[in-house]
């Protein structure tokens, strides 16, 4: 179940797997905001993300995509496959810097069009928009 019961309310588990630790902390803080119902956990490293998904059964998995191993799109899609195998209802959201990685951003967009991911977010969006996207998955 992708929900955790906490203090009489249901909390949606979110796993964040990002290369940029400052960005990851900012996303986690945004998702934990006073009005949200998210239980946010950070993956220690990409090689532990699928295992964490198996243990936590998350509502959503947010992963940063870059041009560098182990954050390349192909590697992220492998993690997606492993996560979906253990948690079929888990929503997959990729985050990409559309200014620094234009071609990669185009490929992430195509992955969404092809149905490989549930959504994507550009790194330049506001915290409020990020929260709204995750809330409406």
Task: Give the predicted meaning of each segment.
Residues 1-15, 19-28, 125-137:
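Non-catalytic signal-transmission and effector/linker regions of two-component phosphorelay proteins
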Residues 21-43:
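Two-component/phosphorelay signaling modules centered on CheY-like receiver
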Residues 27-31, 78-82, 104-113:
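Short, aromatic/basic amphipathic alpha-helical patches
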Residues 44-60, 70:
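Acidic, metal-coordinating helix/loop segments flanking the phosphotransfer/catalytic sites
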Residues 54-56, 82-89:
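Conserved phosphotransfer cores of two-component systems
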Residues 61, 92, 119-120:
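Two-component signal transduction core modules
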Residues 61-86, 96-99, 107:
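Conserved phosphotransfer microenvironments
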Residues 96-136:
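Output/docking surface of receiver
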């Amino acid at each position: 179940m992708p929900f955790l019961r906490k203090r009489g309310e249901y909390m949606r588990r979110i796993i964040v797997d990002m290369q940029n630790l400052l960005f990851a902390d900012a996303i986690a803080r945004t998702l934990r905001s006073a009005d949200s119902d998210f239980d946010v956990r950070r993956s220690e490293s990409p090689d532990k993300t699928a295992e964490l998904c198996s243990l936590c059964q998350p509502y959503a998995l947010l992963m940063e995509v870059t041009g560098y191993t182990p954050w390349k799109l192909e590697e992220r899609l492998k993690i997606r496959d492993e996560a979906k195998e253990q948690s079929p209802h888990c929503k997959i959201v990729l985050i990409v810097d559309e200014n620094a990685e234009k071609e990669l951003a185009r490929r992430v967009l195509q992955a969404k069009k092809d149905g490989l991911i549930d959504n994507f977010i550009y790194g330049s969006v506001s915290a409020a928009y990020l929260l709204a996207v995750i809330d409406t998955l």
